[in-house]
């Protein structure tokens, strides 16, 4: 029954989508992350029993979908730090992460730290009422990325003021 379930919602903008929200179930310790921590991998295993088997796909998924918004990943990880113990991460793609949580979280923290530390990047800010501005901003970010430049998408409605100040202040373009 739902009596023992209490959900806490964490804003995690730009973890593939500008409106991403994590949902933590205090009753079960499950964190539902939408696309974050996901991977395009299919097997009969429901859980991450063999980390070696899924690690390459986990990294590829991060590099393609999460890495371009490494600073947003770091902000989401900070928000996760305020949660009680997480015993499972339920992702939108791939196996449930349960057996090696500290490993997967550490990978995200390390990779995002490397990508965001001292690198020059362009900040592409947008405010989308009907979904058109976010699509054009993603196209602009994709074009910037084709020039081997780093880019950070910034949803002005979903980014807290301190994070916005830091993102824009550190941006080179």
Question: Where in the sequence are the language-model features?
Answer:
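N-terminal beta1-alpha1-beta2 submodule of the flavodoxin-like/Rossmannoid cofactor-binding fold
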Residues: 101-173
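Metallo-beta-lactamase
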Residues: 4-100
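Active-site HxH/HxHxD metal-binding segment of metal-dependent hydrolases
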Residues: 1
